[in-house]
Amino acid sequence: LLCAWLLASSVVAQTAKWQDLYKVKKKDTIYGIAHKYNITIEELMQANPDMQKPDYVLKKGEQLLIPFSKQTPNAAQKPTAPTSTATRQRVANTVNVGVMLPLHNVDGDGQRMTEYYRGVLMACDSLRSQGINTNIFAWNLYKDADVSPVLADANAKNCNLIFGPLYTKQVKPIADFCRKHGIRLVIPFSINGGDVETNDHIFQVYQSKVFTAELSANAFMNRFKDAHPVFVDCNDSTSDKGIFTSELRKRLEAAGLSYSITNLKSSPEMFAKAFSAVKQNVVILNTGRSPQLNSTLAKLNVLRATFPNVRIALFGYNEWLMYKRVYQDYYYKYEAYIPTAYVYNEYAPATANLERSYRQWFKSDMRQALPRFALTGYDQAQFFIRGINKYGVKFEGTQQQNTYTPLQTPLKFKRVSNGGMQNNSFILLHYKPNRTIETISY
């Protein structure tokens, strides 16, 4: 149930506007729904392409996009003078939300962001039932799109909150626009550049590799003060995990703590010499790739068979979550600790219910990606819209201001010097020998 513009590939940047997401009730009719919202049947059908099919039948539980009437422009469409954070006034319990992302079906970026956007829509529908209303404005920003026409749209400056962009070169003009008009800008995915360090209106969700390495090293030093670290050189010239292993070794040396280094090609005897017989050994690989993990597990099996009393734990990488169906038994066996910024639990009732609703709304399953893009959009929209609705311009996304329990992606922001807010939420997933998973939040 996406607007037709999502599939249009010939236009660089487009905007879609609607006043509601309506769930069809038992005795509803197309005419009755259109009449209720003071729009024409044609406008309703244009916003919901499935309704234009010859065999279409209105069904209970179906979700319909309700557009604004073309004959009666909504207030958000009226040109307004530039506003600042100090002067911006927001209608009570209504948040104007902008989405500036590639929303198309041309490539993987567009498909992933479309799913993310669908999650935002589902969050807005959920919030409406709790008395928090939203007006959503979405712009389809291709990779090479000029953002100027989008920022010139009168609807853009009326937003309280904008999600996007995806591409680095679009960040600065959009961020400058948001600072000028007192708008919160949420950058949801990976970008290069340090705009968050200078622009106090940016919320940067993505954590750089260097920042993630620092958080991981902090967690390791906090949890394994009395352990014996064992670094395994996996001979992977393509690995970028040296950012973490170098940082951790510096921390250990500064604290006067010893560690061992071994090699994946070492003989079983030489490999065993790197391990302590009296302390817990924490194994750290310098790659996140599956083949090297597999080889390491095989060597640990030989070690454990030879020395059954040796205590072993693994300290891994976020990529390991992608391999869990293959290695999960080993994660439990060797007490794996996996750093992550999200926790996807398909068996959690709330997650399963949302995935079921997604299937009903959009006639497809979520992409098999980690993290799930729709859940990411849902969590981020819930977090920010709730926060802005409660705290207004004072919302900073700190742990003290959090009003939402996430399904997958926790958020906790901290200000970057005199700049914006950086997400510093960090989780260790601890796979325990009793086959339970402990979630350790920092």
Residue ranges and their predicted role:
Residues 1-3:
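Sec-dependent signal peptide recognition
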Residues 14-442:
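Extracytosolic ligand-binding ectodomains
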Residues 8-10:
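N-terminal signal peptide c-region/cleavage motif recognized by signal peptidases
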